[in-house]
């Protein structure tokens, strides 16, 4: 609410004239690396916009995503980027460009994220998700990594900077593979991204890299035939997702459940995650 008030001064008078009670629920596992906190922040922002009749031109969905990032970073102390704030709003599987957004400038002083939906090219993709059931504050990972990365950017070189550039390459190569329908190559880019994330975390002092449990689930998915698998979220817990070959979703899901059980991950959840074009939706109760 505070973040929205800073950008929508007309909201304060409307809130004084007409109160609101907010209740929330979610089926996103907490601290699982699946944008659970961002989803709730975005839902509340969208509800406030609708309830108080704020302009959906001035406070469009891009602006809501930007305000959500600032709410989490400035109000909640979560060191974070923009992907988790844009994807829930716009939905679909997408290619994102963060050009010009490195320094987290005030709203309006840097570009919005470029969000390119690609779902119409790949509705047949079959993703499987497995959570470790282990909670971790993403900021505890992102804060030292971001500080190190910014220091190397200022210096003009460094190992983390080199790894990040390679990670960017996996994104555009993965996009090309997806558009071509080359799922094997898409899977290779997912795997390569996982290797680079693991290396980045080790560079920043996380001796287990992406995390023992994450590695275990990634291996289980790959051994079951997944074309690619990687963590989602900050690592050291959270979740992984895997790209299953057409018709092989069930065997990958079964393998992930078996691996989680064998590892004693009693709070693990395993489920299919089909690509959907639907993003943020506001529904009014009668």
Regions found by a protein language model. Name each.
Residues 1-7, 21-30:
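Hydrophobic alpha-helical hairpins/lids featuring a short glycine-rich hinge
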Residues 33, 239-241:
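Short aromatic/hydrophobic contact patches that present stacked aromatics
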Residues 33-55:
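DPxDG-like acidic metal-binding loop motif
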Residues 1-16, 53, 66-77, 87-231, ...:
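C-terminal nucleotide
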Residues 19, 235-237:
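Glycine-rich nucleotide-binding loop
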Residues 25-35, 72-78, 159:
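A short glycine/serine-rich beta->alpha loop
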Residues 47, 61-65, 79-83:
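Aromatic- and glycine-enriched pocket-lining scaffold segments that form the walls
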């Amino acid at each position: 609410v505070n973040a929205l008030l800073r950008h929508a001064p007309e909201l304060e008078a409307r809130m004084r004239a007409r109160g609101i009670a907010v209740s929330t629920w979610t089926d996103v596992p907490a601290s699982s690396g699946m944008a659970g906190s961002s989803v709730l922040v975005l839902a509340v922002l969208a509800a406030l916009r609708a309830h108080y009749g704020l302009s959906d031109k001035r406070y469009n969905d891009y602006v809501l995503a930007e305000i959500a990032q600032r709410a989490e970073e400035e109000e909640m102390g979560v060191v974070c980027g923009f992907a988790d704030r844009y994807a829930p709003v716009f939905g679909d599987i997408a290619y994102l460009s963060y050009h010009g957004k490195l320094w987290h400038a005030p709203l309006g002083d840097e570009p919005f994220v470029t969000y390119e939906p690609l779902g119409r090219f790949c509705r047949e993709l079959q993703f499987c998700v497995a959570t470790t059931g282990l909670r971790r504050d993403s900021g505890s990972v992102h804060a030292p990594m971001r500080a190190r990365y910014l220091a190397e950017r200022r210096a003009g070189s460094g190992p983390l900077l080199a790894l990040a550039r390679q990670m960017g390459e996996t994104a555009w190569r993965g996009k090309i593979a997806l558009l071509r329908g080359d799922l094997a190559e898409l899977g290779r880019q997912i795997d390569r991204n996982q290797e680079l994330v693991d290396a980045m975390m080790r560079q920043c002092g996380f001796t287990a890299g992406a995390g023992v449990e994450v590695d275990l689930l990634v291996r289980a998915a790959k051994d079951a035939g997944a074309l690619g698998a990687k963590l989602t979220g900050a690592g050291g817990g959270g979740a992984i997702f895997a790209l299953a070959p057409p018709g092989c979703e069930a065997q990958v899901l079964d393998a992930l459940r078996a691996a989680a059980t064998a590892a004693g991950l009693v709070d693990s959840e395993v489920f299919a995650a089909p690509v959907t074009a639907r993003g943020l939706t506001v529904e009014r109760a009668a």
